[in-house]
Amino acid sequence: MSRKTYEKIANINGMFNMLEQQIIHSQDMAHFRSEFFYVNHEHRENYEALLIYYKNSIDNPIVDGACYILALPEIFNSVDVFESELPFSWVYDENGITETMKSLSIPLQYLVAAALEVTDVNIFKPSGFTTGMNNWNIAQMRIFWQYTAIIRKEAL
């Protein structure tokens, strides 16, 4: 292995160690959320607002994780989030995938689809997870990894 590969492995291991610590210390929610990966300050503000709006996010890690993804500025600014009963109700309806979902960038469509797959809702074939893993850049990967830490915060 070249030194560069070792550095990549060390960085990835460091990120997973950080995510594990977030899960371990998830009972301190203010600290837990302050350590999250946010694409920018707006992402964090949107997330905090959604947690207040979707009150069941406190007891439901799936809703909490959905709020984290929905808070991404590109999604948050495209969706009338406060008209939805659940964070992802805008993704599809009786006619299939909505125009709002189709208007998102392709990597974010995969991210939303991968998050829905956690609840056995599959909107893409191949899956959003599979397609995302083959196409996401490192920031999008970090968003997905953070999402997994949120929904699994009770794992330890």
Show where each model-derived region lies.
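Extended, charge-biased low-complexity segments
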Residues: 1-107, 120-156
